């Protein structure tokens, strides 16, 4: 499923209608002024999330386990602030429709982007991002480096309608190709070129499938499994890796920078690059915890479950 550019032939007629209705709604919201987006609309969505107590038990459990040093009032304050973030993410997603550099170039400010482009001119590199702030803004990088091929690696959605909708929302530029995670290596091997830089963008903080060789790191006070795909690619092809560090300036406005965690040539121990990513992510989450995706059941797998299923555990990767 490597970037079929919104091939509606895969959908039934009623799914096509649903897709176009949703796209029309997104286009409508994308043309609203900021005071309406982040005033009335975001406030309404935030109210709905709070009234529905959206994934409240999961959020509170994750926060309590991650920050045992915080009291209950502080935990609940972060939860309410997270609902604000989630409402903003929904608004920002709706408003991605029809995005252009002229209209939306100010949404994400990249620090030292020109120096970064020059430093990696003619060299492929990996951007390891996370579900922090509004991660759907990160492909806006493609507007700054128009000569590069941007691979947006993602997990396909179960709903074909929303799969097509999100692919359309993310097609922000001709040099963006959305690649299903299972097709990453195949697509990269087919399209890598000495004539052009290829940027692999990966959201790397999801919970991986539990396997016998799943490795654990100390992260936010808990044993946590991490996806190792970026590290394997980097070591196989000698590609540098950059952690995407972000901060929110105000609703709908972010600043991001690239922090190198592997230069493509350093001799490192197994799992070391993934460990550096986990450490950088934890430091960022602790600075503004309300910006991370706490409603995801991130710790559904444990070393104990690994031992139960496979008879052994690679507990903590000797971290």
Language model features with spans:
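A broad structural signal for alpha-helix termini and local helix breaks/kinks
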Residues: 32, 52, 66-68, 146, ...
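Soluble or luminal CAZymes and related metallo-dependent hydrolases
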Residues: 17-20, 55, 180, 272-276
């Amino acid at each position: 499923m490597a970037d079929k550019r919104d091939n509606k032939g895969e959908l039934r007629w009623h799914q096509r209608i649903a897709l176009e209705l949703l796209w029309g709604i997104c286009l409508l919201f994308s043309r609203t002024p900021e005071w309406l987006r982040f005033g009335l609309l975001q406030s309404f969505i935030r109210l709905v999330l709070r009234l529905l107590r959206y994934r409240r038990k999961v959020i509170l459990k994750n926060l309590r386990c991650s920050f045992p040093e915080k009291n209950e009032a502080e935990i609940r304050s972060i939860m309410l602030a997270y609902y604000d973030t989630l409402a903003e993410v929904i608004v920002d997603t709706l408003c991605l429709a029809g995005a252009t550099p002229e209209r939306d170039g100010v949404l994400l400010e990249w620090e030292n982007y020109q120096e970064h482009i020059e430093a990696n001119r003619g060299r492929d590199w990996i951007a390891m991002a996370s579900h922090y702030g509004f991660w759907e803004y990160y492909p806006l990088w493609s507007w700054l480096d128009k000569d590069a091929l941007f691979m947006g690696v993602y997990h396909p959605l179960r709903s074909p309608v929303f799969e097509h909708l999100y692919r359309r929302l993310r097609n922000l530029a001709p040099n963006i190709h959305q690649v299903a995670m299972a097709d990453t290596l195949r697509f990269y091997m087919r399209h890598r070129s000495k004539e052009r830089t290829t940027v692999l963008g990966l959201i790397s903080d999801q919970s991986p499938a539990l396997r016998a060789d799943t490795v654990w790191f100390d992260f936010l006070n808990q044993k946590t499994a991490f996806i190792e795909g970026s590290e394997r690619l980097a070591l196989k092809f000698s590609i540098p890796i950059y952690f995407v560090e972000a901060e929110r300036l105000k609703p709908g406005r972010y600043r991001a920078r690239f922090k190198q965690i592997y230069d493509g040539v350093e001799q490192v121990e197994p799992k070391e690059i993934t460990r550096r990513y986990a450490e950088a992510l934890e430091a960022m989450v602790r600075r503004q915890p309300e910006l991370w995706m706490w409603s995801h059941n991130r710790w559904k797998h444990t070393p104990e479950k690994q031992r139960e299923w496979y008879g052994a555990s690679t507990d903590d990767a000797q971290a």
